[in-house]
Amino acid sequence: VKTKAGSATKNIVEMNDGTVHGNLYGAALTDAASTGNADANEMTINGGTVSGTVYGSHNAGAGDAKGNTITIKGGSLHGIYGGFAAGTGVTTGNTVNLGDGEHSLAAGTTINGTIYGGNKANDADNTLNVNTNATAGNIANFDKLKFTLKDSTLNPANSVLRLTTGATNNLDWTKLDVDATGLTVTPKSYEAYRVNLMDNANGVSFTKGATNTYASSGAKQRTNGDLEYVIDTDNHTANAAQYVYFEALQFQNKQNAEFAAADGTKNEAWGGRTKVGNGVKNNTLTVTGGTLTQAAYGGLAENFTRDSAGNLNTAGNATENKLVLNAGANTLNAYGAQVRTKGGSAAENTVLLSGGTVTGSLYGGALTDAGATGSATANEITVKGGTVTGDVYGGFTNGSGATTGNIVNLGDGDHSLSTGTNIAGTIYGGNKADVTGNTLNVNTNATAGNIQNFGKLQFNLNSNALTQSTPMLRLSASGGTNNLDWRTLDVNAEKFNAPIKTYEAYNLVLMENIN
């Protein structure tokens, strides 16, 4: 339009094929003296080549270029502007859609330049909708970023938006959103379902102007039944090293998680896990093979969300989770549940060691943050077989809370331990001095390095699980066994039916420590 007073509004342009040797405009006011606006225009590019720049609207005058929409479905393109105002006008409220929300981009689609919401720094309501996998040089001047993830339009093996030219800056973390209602996710026991939303090897910054927009919330979360959706940067700061990612984890009611020989070697495996402080509850992981170089967890609780002051939130409990280690299992450490938050607790978690090898230590429930204020209580470990090279803890905390009411069972009460079963280290009711309610149940002949921090020792005699010629509990580590309470040592002989001779008493050594 070459008029000073006229406007260019509500025009529609669709490009299907061919080549534009120059720029492509949804609408244009070409007179520098123009006072009109170039608003609310629509453009759809299905294919073809544009050798110049794509403009939702271009205003050479003093007016605005706002409220325009560009939808890219295919083509070979360079720079893209939702709106461009050469004068004093604004370029706000523009929308660029990568994909139509129903289909992937056409094969061979390229965007070699930067996608701008508008050419002005005021980017209010400029929105980039990423509806499918796409690659561009960069993005700039967008107020809002929205990623729509659907099975029909997404290849999760590739980053949703890959940016290749320079760092991406001046984004607003509070206005990044993800719609995953059309996505089917199945987290594995050793990895979350993960999609990289943004991928820029030069970095992605959510410092908007001088404001760190990430600090007031940290990781974002959505909850869908037993699943949590986590949106975060790769280093949990405003300045991602390369990736902004979407993860799905099941934090509760995962009863059938498995890690087997076919899974090979991984760092970790878990039954249920949270990264945003949800309650990790009622999960079970069974390990039958493979190698875990860090740990196996029935439940694992973390929290990367932040409060309004930018501090990490402290919530995140783990309760009623279970870890089962069978023959073939091989892990460094093992936990009924581990809590890495400061305010969380670990309670009523269980470990069943039937076989396999723990080359580190075994924990019923553990709080690993040095500033942890919660407690590790009422956790239970049952040993039926296997080996532990390190120590065994019913409850453990690196912080200030209690480790009371925990139970360790040596044997299940009906059977002897599997051949070769051994605990080389010390068995602790808890690692704190308060031993209230910590109980060691010795149900069959067993060996360990030592025992410590138990309020009660219970020897349960079952003739079917007992060898008279061997002490029920043989302790082999150097140093004596101390701080036991004779008043709370007890023997239960309800299942004891060995014949008693007429000329001598039945003699059984309950506990032996030659040191």
Model-found features: residue ranges?
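Short, polar loop/linker segments at the starts of domains and inter-domain junctions
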Residues: 37-38, 90-96, 157-163, 267-270, ...
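Extracellular beta-strand/loop-rich repeat segments of large surface/secreted proteins
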Residues: 89, 103, 108-192, 399-404, ...
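Intrinsically disordered, low-complexity segments used as extracellular stalks/linkers
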Residues: 4, 10, 25, 42-45, ...
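Outer-membrane translocation/initiation segment of Type V secreted surface proteins
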Residues: 194, 199-263, 496-515
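Short, solvent-exposed linear patches
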Residues: 6-9, 36-39, 63-66, 89-93, ...
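Feature marks extracellular polysaccharide-active and adherence modules
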Residues: 2-4, 14-16, 21-31, 44-46, ...
